Structures are given as C-alpha cells and as structure tokens.
Amino acid sequence: MLSHGINAVGLFFIADMLMSRLKTHNMNEMGGIANNNSLFAVLFMIVLLGTVALPLTNGFVGEFLLLTGIYQFKSWMAIFGGLTIILGAVYMFRSYQAIMLGSRHLNEGEFHPMTLSEKTVLGTIAFLVILLGVYPSFLMNAAAPSIKSLLMIINAG
C-alpha cells in the first residue's frame, strides 16, 4: 500500500504539472514535452514504471506477492489479475507516448522548466520508486511482525 501511495502521489503531481502548464485535460492536445523538458520526461517514466510494477521498482514486489498468494488460492483469479496488470501497463505506456512523445510540438517556453520544489518532490518520489524496488526488504522486515500476528489471528479463527 505504501508503494501504491507513492506512485499515486507521483502521478497526481505529474497530472497537476501538466494541466497547470498546458491548460488542458485532453491528452490529444499534449505532446512533444520530452523534447522541451527531458528531466520531467525521465522522472515521469520512473514513476510510470513503478506504477506498472516493472521489476526493480516499488510496485513489483507487492504485485508479485499478491499474485503469488492469489495463485495458491485460485489460479484463475491470478491469471485474471495478471491480465488486468498488463492492460493497465498498456494504457499507461500509451498515455506516456501521447503526452511526452506525441506529435504536437510545444512552443518555446510553453512547458517551462521544472522549479526547484518540483524537482525536489518528483525526484524524491522517483528515488523512492527505485529504492523500494531494489531494496524491498527494508519495508518487508519492518512489516513482518505485524503480518505474522495478523496471520496467526486469521489462522486461529
């Protein structure tokens, strides 16, 4: 849930940056942003990769554990869950392509460079996406006692 929260905050922050700068909610009216602001494009991609649960990002560990647990219970549910993850990834990558690499070419200064506070917030989120994907045991070890006690309660009932 922590990883989901990090990714959701990152995506909402990115959406706010896009809408406040471009004054539109329509992805078809965006495009070509990567040409003007490569740092934003890279940070957006890192958050997106965490959201689609690519290995070595924060979303992967939770998705993997979830699907593994579901597979032991009902394999068809895990297959369905895996398909929804794939469809979500397709949607996210198509959105990124339209927004960052689309055919519209922005005028100089239309998507102004990121401010220091925006770089700090988005950079921190991107750092956490990678850190928690490369080193997930940090959170897993912290949560282990609570998980064990919860499993004992569930198995006792």
Residue ranges: model-predicted function:
Residues 6-11, 147-151:
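Alpha-helical transmembrane segments and their membrane-interface exit regions
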Residues 7-88, 109-128:
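Interfacial and helix-entry/exit segments of alpha-helical transmembrane bundles
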Residues 37-39, 92-157:
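Cytoplasmic/organellar membrane-interface segments at the starts of transmembrane helices
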